[in-house]
Amino acid sequence: MVIPPPIPSGVPKSSRWKIPLIVIGVIVGLLIVFGIQIAFWSFSAREFELSTSQKESVITIDYASEFFLIDKDVGIEEWDCQRFIDGSIQIYYLYVDESTSLDCTISVERNRGDSLASYIAEWQTLKLRNEFSEVKVEIEATDKVFSWGDDSKFAFQLSDDTRNGFAFIARKDNKIFFVDAWGLLLEDPEEISEFLTPKLEIFAAESYLD
């Protein structure tokens, strides 16, 4: 009787099909997870219409034109209002022209922990965006100029050591108010307060989540 050759050690005969099946299973699993993530982000946010008071809480180019000489007709405005699956919301406003940009974002979270995380992330994003922009923008933090709410940060924004804008962020309870202005400059603390405070008071009184 002819004895069959021995199976090489370390590669059991029954495992020859297991390895490809495991690899295929891992790939399929990753694709499923990836698909679930895509579906989650695609369906977790819904646009919503702002109420009059909610819209009034946002710093827009129309409001800024009461303080600055702006030819607002030459720029582009953008609104994006999203309500997420956990009930949190984000209101995003942007105006841009050749020399001016104005970004005002309001975020409302479901709890204090999330609001603190959003508060920190928003400011860090500003710093990173300025660091890697085509024209490097420096942040001159000076919280003594203006403060508000439970937490806040104020900074002038500089290019070539010259102030040409400012940024401000504040947290009140579970709400975050952020404004990033370029080509719009106020340096006097009283003028800055006159510009920001009316909108912040509306922001503080508005619940947004009702």
Residue ranges and their predicted role:
Residues 35-103, 131-147, 200-204, 209-210:
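N-terminal "mature-domain start" segment
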Residues 1-15:
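Low-complexity, intrinsically disordered extramembrane tails and loops of integral membrane proteins
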